Amino acid sequence: MVITVLGERFFDPMIDVFLDAVEAERPGFDVVQPWRRIGDPAAFRALAEEAGLSGFTLREDTDILTLESPDDWWRIVIGSGLRRTAEALGEETAERVRARCGEAMQALGITQVDLTSQYLLATRP
């Protein structure tokens, strides 16, 4: 059996830009990030052990995604769990968040994001 979860580096460094933009546009807005619960390998290992799995192997990979323009970042937002936040903000606020992200991306010279995935390989008991 294989179980895959997102790792600690979730669209770094743009995730922080996105969260800052959301906070600037809607202070106190709760951005739901369920992947953070088991993002680090120790938490993932503990969850597997709690589920009764043993003799498993954990592996972590990092993919680098190239961003050629701010539109590439927004496609990632809309194609990921961040879409929930963008939709909850409403169209006008989401557009302002999108603009802030694009401006920061260009100002900071961000041309790629990292995405870490963790894999648990186990044999069913």
Language-model segments: residues:
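Conserved Class I S-adenosyl-L-methionine
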Residues: 35-125
